[in-house]
Amino acid sequence: ATRFLSKENALYWIRRTVAENYQEIKNWIKQDVETYIELSISSELITGEGIAFHTDWKNIFSVHSVVVVLHRDRNNLFYVKTAYPIAGFDDVDDILDAMEEYDS
């Protein structure tokens, strides 16, 4: 489970994810096939925090990626269905180490 650090933090990462995926969004609207699209970005900056299954839940991990899901209506207007921070590639080692420590 993850969360953004604040409302302002969430809005920043949603806007940045949409901006960095602008061309993909344009292509999605043109294709008119799927009603939703899942976008993601990774960053060197902390995007949020979370806990991991099979670890001590008092251990909060910083995460460095974001997923934003957009939904489109019949008029090609879209809105953010959901957005959440996720563990990035570089976050996985810390989480796996904590899982190993917890299970031993």
Placement of each model-derived feature along the sequence:
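Functional cores of ribonucleases/endoribonucleases
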Residues: A1-S104
